[in-house]
């Protein structure tokens, strides 16, 4: 990942870096890897995420049908 610094504006470069890392999911990944996750917990989390994605997709589809 690369961030250019213009006019010695380090604060802006740090903000850009944080935004890029957030967009890439780096913070979420670091938080996940901080502690070991048992395979059973990983399966449970993945299943919950899939359900969340499905519900979100269904909500968006129902809202698109209303408009």
Curated annotation (Swiss-Prot):
InterPro entries: Ribosomal_bS21 (IPR001911), Ribosomal_bS21_sf (IPR038380). One of its GO terms (cellular component) is ribosome. Keywords: Ribonucleoprotein, Ribosomal protein. GO terms for molecular function: structural constituent of ribosome. The keyword Ribosomal protein applies. One of its GO terms (biological process) is translation. The keyword Disulfide bond does not apply. Belongs to the bacterial ribosomal protein bS21 family. NCBIfam families: S21p. HAMAP family: Ribosomal_bS21. This is Small ribosomal subunit protein bS21.
């Amino acid at each position: 990942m690369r961030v250019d610094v213009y006019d010695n504006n380090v604060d802006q470069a740090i903000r850009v870096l944080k935004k890029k890392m957030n967009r890439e999911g780096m913070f979420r990944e670091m938080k996940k890897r901080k502690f070991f996750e048992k395979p059973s917990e990983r399966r449970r989390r993945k299943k919950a995420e899939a359900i969340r994605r499905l519900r979100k997709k269904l909500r968006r589809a129902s809202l698109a049908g209303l408009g």
